[in-house]
Swiss-Prot record:
Localization in the cell: Cytoplasm
Site (Important for substrate specificity): 18, 80, 162
EC category: hydrolase
Record protein name field: dTTP/UTP pyrophosphatase
Known catalytic reactions: dTTP + H2O = dTMP + diphosphate + H(+); UTP + H2O = UMP + diphosphate + H(+)
Originating organism: Porphyromonas gingivalis (strain ATCC 33277 / DSM 20709 / CIP 103683 / JCM 12257 / NCTC 11834 / 2561)
Length: 199
């Protein structure tokens, strides 16, 4: 599948092992490269649902500005945020903040949005995906256990749906499960397929 993409050097511009795992599931050859250091800042007042797409575009531009885009490069960048009460929960700075985030999510439904950019030369295709996740109530003991064993400090909202906490606490997911992991691969597949056919 996706034979039309064989002429491209596909690069996943992300350090995330989860995104690497998910992209591998599409059975395409790609290289994973760490992104140039960028501040994940966004304009004040920007709609929270638009933030991940904004950041995915910023990552692509950072990659391009460093001269890391060759003519054959097809770059995939992404960013995921957790939104609750209209506020973004990013990656926690420390254990205390992670615990506070999990207590906020406990017993409630929150939104997970991932923005994705596919960049080639000066063309960029961008899209986003939204899922709703409902958590059961989490006890302090469960939160402490999860933070001690899994240390989710590299994850938006302080949790990984594919980890222990996902098994014991997630009651319902409306939308893409893989989007919550960090990459809506069903949409990405269709975009890559369309890109390969039109270029």
């Amino acid at each position: 599948m996706l034979d039309n993409l064989k002429k491209y050097k596909i690069v996943l511009g992300s350090q995330s092992p989860r995104r690497k795992e998910l992209l591998s599931g599409l059975d395409i050859r790609f290289e994973q490269k760490a992104m140039p250091d960028i501040a994940e800042d966004y304009p004040a007042g920007l709609d929270p649902e638009k933030v991940p797409l904004y950041l995915a575009r910023m990552k692509a531009e950072a990659y391009r500005s460093k001269g890391m885009m060759q003519d054959s490069t097809l770059l995939i960048t992404a960013d995921t945020v957790v939104i609750v009460d209209g506020a973004i929960l990013g990656k926690p700075q420390d254990r205390e903040e992670a615990a506070r985030m999990l207590r906020t999510l406990s017993g409630r439904t929150h939104q997970v949005v991932t923005g994705v950019c596919i960049s080639h030369r000066w063309e960029t295709r961008a899209f986003s995906c939204s899922s709703l996740v409902t958590f059961a109530h989490l006890s302090d003991e469960e939160i402490d256990y999860y933070l001690e064993r899994y240390r989710p400090y590299d994850k938006a909202g302080s949790y990984g749906i594919q980890e222990w906490i996902g098994y014991i606490a997630i009651q319902r997911v409306e939308g893409s499960f893989y989007n919550v992991m960090g990459l809506p691969v069903h949409l990405l597949y269709n975009e890559l397929k369309d890109f390969g056919e039109s270029n």
